[in-house]
Amino acid sequence: MIRCFHVTKRYGAITALTDISFQIDEGEFVFLTGQSGAGKTTLLRLLYRAELPTSGQLIVAGRNLATMPRRQVPRFRRRLGLVFQDFKLIEDRTVFDNVALVGLAVGFSFTESQRRASELLRLVDVDGRAQLFPAQVSGGEQQRVSIARALMTAPKLLLADEPTGNLDPERANEIMRIFHAINQSGTTVLVATHDADLIGTVGRRALTLEAGRLNTLAVASQVS
């Protein structure tokens, strides 16, 4: 699903990533760990083609990102699910609309968009909040909505950048268990986090970045 070959990313004189190589197979659940500033967000931005590496090769979902024409990037991103720390919900639209509008944007019919939005809000257990606005629900519920939105196109790969950074430990563990369920359904999941305590909640391997270098490959403990 993801193959990264000797990727380096520089911003002028600053090197954000140095000689990164790894592989994530289809159906895996992998954590990307490291302290703030280690390069996690930079690597994720490369994976969803928000930026290009300075050198090296990235193959994601069978596509070479370095050679992908710019006009094909939106279609490529529809094959991905993206979840962010700050939710990125539309504040003046309801919870339901925040999910359903994605379907309309990618070409689903109105009926299909409504159906999938209802199913996904049930999946993440916020269907009872569907007609509220983002400001009227908790941070944990907003993150659940953002996950439902990310799943609207039935992505094969889900990328999450510090998805629990604004949540308390209990809500964070709930979000991790949702990701686990998504992975169990066949979706490849990559979660970037600086919170080492989260890794044991799902029990998967972890790629660890330190100062822009991939230093270790760890195996997280299994959930009891």
Locate each region found by the language model:
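Helix-to-loop junction immediately C-terminal to a conserved catalytic motif
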Residues: 48
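Conserved ABC transporter NBD signature motif
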Residues: 56-64
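ABC ATPase NBD coupling module
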Residues: 65-81, 110, 182-184
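Short coil-to-helix segment of the ABC ATPase nucleotide-binding domain corresponding to the Q-loop/switch region
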Residues: 93-102
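Conserved signature/switch motifs of ABC ATPase nucleotide-binding domains
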Residues: 132-135, 153, 185
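Conserved ABC ATPase signature
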Residues: 133-137, 141-143
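Catalytic Walker B motif of ABC-type/P-loop ATPase nucleotide-binding domains
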Residues: 158-161
